[in-house]
Design a protein with these regions (language model features):
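N-terminal switch/interaction subdomains of large nucleotide-dependent motors and GTPases
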Residues: 1-25
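Conserved C-terminal RecA-like helicase domain
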Residues: 24, 28, 42-179
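A short beta-strand element within the Helicase C-terminal
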Residues: 178-182, 187-196
């Protein structure tokens, strides 16, 4: 442990622009990407029932605010793209019942982050709150939607160093966006991410 505040500060300072960038994504960020895919799959299951509702949001967005430094944002976008490509390859090649398959990893993420809340969703809502779309969903119901949930996910580094912009279409019928946006200041002030 640390005995002095100055020792603590030396070991926990904020990243600087020229620090070495991690060469791999931390497990927590990989898990967050898997959670985003599972959330998108759940929303796809509920889409048919919700599409007529004024609460329906067709877009699916994930925000990663890893650093205010553009170099770090761009490098993170590259690592997330690589990881997403690995997930896609695994989904295409693995069998759901195989040990070590991506589907086992999805199920583990489901059990640790989703299962209890989704199966008991009504207990988390305020008394008297009624939302017909908040129905329990099981992993076995989500499993067939994982492939379609992954299809078309874009990874964008949204900053001043590149031309990538996050723009949601206004015209109908809307082609829903699935996007993982990595950024800093461009995404932090006055920008609304839809389906976050």
């Amino acid at each position: 442990g640390f005995t002095k505040w100055t020792e603590y500060r030396k070991g926990t300072r904020a990243s600087k622009r020229h620090d070495d960038f991690p060469q791999t994504l931390p497990r927590s960020l990989k898990d967050a990407v898997l959670c985003f895919i599972l959330s998108t799959a759940v929303r796809e299951i509920r889409k048919l029932d919700q599409s007529g509702s004024k609460l329906f949001e067709p877009h699916n967005s994930m925000l990663i605010h890893i650093s205010r430094f553009i170099t770090w944002q761009n490098k993170t976008a590259g690592l997330v793209k690589e990881y997403l490509d690995q997930i896609i390859a695994s989904v295409e090649n693995d069998s759901p019942g195989d040990m070590g398959s991506i589907f086992i990893e999805f199920e583990n993420i489901w059990n640790s982050h989703f299962s209890d809340i989704i199966n008991n969703i009504r207990t988390y809502l305020p008394e008297g709150y009624v939302d017909p779309f908040m129905a329990p969903v099981t992993f076995s119901a989500v499993l067939p939607h994982i492939t379609s949930a992954i299809e078309g996910i874009d990874v964008l580094a949204v900053n001043s160093s590149n031309k990538q912009k996050l723009q949601y279409p206004d015209s109908f019928p809307v082609t829903p966006l699935k996007v993982i946006a990595i950024g800093g200041n461009r995404l932090s002030r006055g920008f609304t991410m839809k389906g976050l």
